[in-house]
Amino acid sequence: MSPLNRRRFLQTSALGTAALGTACADNGLDRQLSYTTLGPALEEAIRLSEASALASSTRWSLGATLVHCAQSIEFSMFGFPQAKPAWFQQTLGAGAYQVFAWRGRMTHDLAEPIPGAPAIPDATPTSQALARLQQAATAFQAWQGALMPHFAYGALDKTAYEQAHAMHIANHLSHFIAKA
C-alpha cells in the first residue's frame, strides 16, 4: 500500500470508528429512524408536524429543524455557502458518507448549522417550515441540472444525494416524538 493510500485508509478508518462510536452514545431520545429516500422522511415530518404536542431531545424546535433540512436540500441544487477543503471532502467527508450509507443512517451534531447558512429563528412556525421542506424536496426530485458538491461529502450523484438528505432528515426527526 502506497503512503498516500495508507494515509487515506487510516483517515477513513478513524472517521468510521468515530462515526460508529457516536451512534452508540446515549444522548437522550433517539428513535434511530432510517430512510434512504425522501418520501418516508417527508411522511414522518408531516406526522410530527400534525402532533398536538412533541417531546424532543434537541435544542432546536421542529420548525427550525425542518428549515435546516430544507436548506441542505436547497444548497445541493444551488451551492453551499461554505465548503470544507477539497482534501477533506475527498478523504474524511467521503469516508463519513460511505460509513453512513453502509449503516443506513447518519449521526451528526443536531444543533450545528450548515456552515455559512442564514440563521434560523427557533420560533419558525412548523407549518411554514414543513411547506419549505416539501417544496425543496419536490424541487430536488424534479431537478435536471448538475448537483453542487456537498460541503463535507463532496460530489454526490442524485441517488447518493437523496440518500444523504433522507438520512439527514431521519437523524433530526429521530429526536422528536409525538406525545399522546
Regions found by a protein language model. Name each.
Residues 12-15, 47, 71, 178:
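Residues within well-ordered alpha-helical secondary structure of globular protein domains
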Residues 16, 38-44, 68, 72, ...:
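Amphipathic, well-ordered alpha-helical segments in soluble domains
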Residues 24-29, 78-133, 140-141:
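Short, helix-capping/interhelical loops that line the mouth of catalytic, cofactor-
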Residues 51-101, 142-143, 147-180:
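Short, contiguous alpha-helical
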